[in-house]
Amino acid sequence: MNLIDQIENEQLRSDLPLFVSGDTIIVQVKVREGERERLQAFEGVVIAKKNRGIGSAFTVRKISHGEGVERVFQTHSKMIDSIKVKRRGKVHQAKLYYLRGLTGKKARIKEKLQIRK
């Protein structure tokens, strides 16, 4: 293992939950306002996820005041305080870019139900 890989592996976060495209998540982001720092929640559907080691990222989409808002988060960023999975979505695609063109009830995603044994 070379030096660059070793440094990247030290910076990877292991406290993040497992989530996939279609899941509704709440991301707590650290926001600096002057000298203060506070947490801001961003809740939406994961429409894309890119797994590239330290360069991993995911895109979250939500509807705010009738307008679609998308935000790309770096998975291992220090600006992300926590991620909470609110509900699991049942989808067949890895990238849900088709949701950009849908509004209202057409943009809903079915919930994946856990089967107890």
Swiss-Prot record:
GO annotation, biological process: translation
Q: Name one GO cellular component term.
A: cytosolic large ribosomal subunit
* Source species, domain of life: Bacteria
Any one GO molecular-function label of the UniProt entry? structural constituent of ribosome
Entries under Gene3D superfamilies matching the protein: 2.30.30.790
> What family does the database annotate?
Belongs to the bacterial ribosomal protein bL19 family.
HAMAP family with a match to the protein in the record: Ribosomal_bL19 (MF_00402)
According to its UniProt entry, the function of this protein is described as:
This protein is located at the 30S-50S ribosomal subunit interface and may play a role in the structure and function of the aminoacyl-tRNA binding site.
* Protein name, as recorded: Large ribosomal subunit protein bL19
**What is the organism of origin for this protein?**
Vesicomyosocius okutanii subsp. Calyptogena okutanii (strain HA)
Q: What is the lineage of its organism?
A: Bacteria, Pseudomonadati, Pseudomonadota, Gammaproteobacteria, Candidatus Pseudothioglobaceae
